[in-house]
């Protein structure tokens, strides 16, 4: 197991070769960071590029996929690619951090900086998935509509992570939507390290709410549990199954296809706060959304704000 913080195409040597493997499993740091970049920018271009690169790696190379972990989020993005869009590294990092710490106007995220270096204009980011998705902000404000949308986004981000090739990992507390733990500031041994913001003890009392559908936990926990069961019951999610991205003709919507001899899967993810249409055009019949059970064609798919679809069609 290894951790390499660099672009996917530069990770390949650390795996060794198929005949002579070195690392058998690597943290998928770049896709994680690119996911949060996409949350802040609402533009999937970079994330799609990451998936395109990974899709061309040998299937023997296995990644450990995650949204959050014990450590901070470092912005090791493909800045050479982003320069094609006029995006420069230092100001872009500042924007990402401003958005995800809630400083940017109308940001729903609540995080904190780690290792802030004003001289270099560089800093890393800390925070739980729930807080970065808006559950903390809207919960504090008593905005139920905002909370519901934030929970939907939390589920969508986990659905995206769970549909990638590799081994998915859900960070402790994310399954019940735990928000940031600011009590670390009261401990002299922890106060200087903002990573403790997302290292709070698992809240077992909060976890009891998972049986109440009116609560955040009662919406989030069953949804993630369902996604996990769907993933384990469909062979199309196996790591050896090839995948490729497809055009949606909307920069805020990501879609990719996984396909084997048994099934064809299309994952669609809306990173926008607005309802959208994914202008895909798969002309091979009806699909079933594995999440809702709804049947629909994979054409001009209407997708709610921060929503997702797991469309699947049996080939038997």
Q: What spans do the regions from the language model cover?
A:
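Active-site and adjacent substrate-binding regions of carbohydrate-active enzymes
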Residues: 1-316
């Amino acid at each position: 197991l290894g951790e390499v913080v660099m672009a996917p195409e530069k990770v390949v040597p650390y795996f060794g070769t198929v005949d002579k493997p070195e690392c058998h499993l690597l943290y998928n740091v770049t896709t994680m960071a690119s996911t949060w970049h996409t949350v802040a920018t609402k533009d999937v271009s970079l994330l799609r590029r990451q998936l395109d690169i990974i899709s061309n790696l040998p299937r023997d190379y296995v990644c450990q996929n995650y949204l959050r972990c014990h450590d901070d989020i470092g912005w090791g993005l493909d800045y050479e690619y982003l320069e094609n869009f006029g995006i420069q590294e230092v100001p872009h990092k500042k924007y990402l951090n401003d958005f995800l710490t809630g400083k940017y106007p109308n940001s729903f995220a609540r995080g904190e900086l780690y290792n802030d270096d004003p001289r270099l204009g560089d800093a890393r980011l800390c925070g739980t998935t729930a807080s970065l998705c808006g559950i903390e902000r809207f919960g504090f404000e008593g905005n139920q509509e905002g909370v519901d949308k934030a929970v939907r986004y939390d589920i969508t981000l986990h659905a995206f992570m769970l549909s990638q090739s590799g081994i998915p990992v859900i960070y402790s507390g994310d399954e019940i939507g735990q928000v940031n733990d600011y009590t670390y500031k009261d401990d002299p041994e922890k106060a200087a390290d903002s990573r403790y913001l997302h290292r709070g003890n698992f809240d077992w009392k909060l976890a009891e709410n998972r049986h109440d559908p009116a609560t955040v936990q009662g919406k989030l926990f069953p949804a993630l549990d369902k996604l996990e069961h769907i993933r384990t019951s469909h062979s199309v999610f196996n790591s050896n199954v090839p995948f490729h991205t497809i055009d949606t003709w909307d920069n805020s919507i990501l879609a990719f296809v996984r396909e084997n001899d048994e099934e064809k899967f299309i994952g669609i993810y809306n990173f926008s706060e607005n309802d959208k249409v994914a202008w895909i055009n798969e002309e091979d019949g009806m699909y079933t959304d594995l999440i809702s059970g709804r049947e629909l064609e994979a054409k001009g798919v209407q997708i709610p704000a921060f929503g997702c679809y797991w469309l699947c069609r049996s080939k038997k």
